[in-house]
Amino acid sequence: MALERTFSIVKPDAVKRNLVGEIYHRIEKAGLQIIAAKMVSLTEAQASGFYAEHEGKEFFGPLKEFMTSGPIMVQVLEGENAIARYRELMGKTNPEEAACGTIRADYAISMRYNSVHGSDSPESAAREIEFFFPESEICPRPAE
């Protein structure tokens, strides 16, 4: 199977609680490589652009407010079937429905403060990666 890339965010609630290292450990333990990463503080304009597909929905304002409330970690993950593997590792959006041992089951506070984001398709992964990372900042690692 070919390598695939996905996009991941460690959200403000998890960064504030110093969970970045724990989440990165789980990502790598799951066989995914972090090939780009940086800490950013989103502006309201950036949050609006990133979440443009949700504009007009009831949760759009609160989502922007949350995502601009503190720094986030954004990263590009690479591995076989990376999108599905990372989504399984994250668990369901609602932490009460997330399987035991998933990131959201273990660390999320609520549906809004659910610690992580991951792309849901190859198309969204490409768009989200491009939003934060020029190709020059992505550093694929050699196969072992």
From Swiss-Prot:
Compartments, as annotated in UniProt: Cytoplasm
Catalytic activity from the UniProt record: a 2'-deoxyribonucleoside 5'-diphosphate + ATP = a 2'-deoxyribonucleoside 5'-triphosphate + ADP; a ribonucleoside 5'-diphosphate + ATP = a ribonucleoside 5'-triphosphate + ADP
Pfam families attached to this UniProt entry: NDK
Enzyme superclass (EC): transferase
Gene3D superfamilies in the record: Nucleoside diphosphate kinase-like domain
Source species, domain of life: Bacteria
Keyword Secreted listed: no
Keyword Magnesium: yes
Keywords: ATP-binding, Cytoplasm, Kinase, Magnesium, Metal-binding, Nucleotide metabolism, Nucleotide-binding, Phosphoprotein, Transferase
Binding site for ATP: 11, 59, 87, 93, 104, 114
InterPro entries, A to Z: NDK-like_dom, NDK-like_dom_sf, Nucleoside_diP_kinase, Nucleoside_diP_kinase_AS
Residues in the signal sequence: none
EC number: 2.7.4.6
Gene Ontology biological process terms from the UniProt entry: CTP biosynthetic process; GTP biosynthetic process; UTP biosynthetic process
Cellular component GO terms held in the UniProt record: cytoplasm
Entry annotation: catalytic residues: 117
Entry cofactors: Mg(2+)
Assembly behavior: Homotetramer.
Family: Belongs to the NDK family.
Stored NCBIfam families: PRK00668.1
Function: Major role in the synthesis of nucleoside triphosphates other than ATP. The ATP gamma phosphate is transferred to the NDP beta phosphate via a ping-pong mechanism, using a phosphorylated active-site intermediate.
Protein name as annotated: Nucleoside diphosphate kinase
Lineage, uppermost ranks: Bacteria, Pseudomonadati, Pseudomonadota, Gammaproteobacteria, Vibrionales
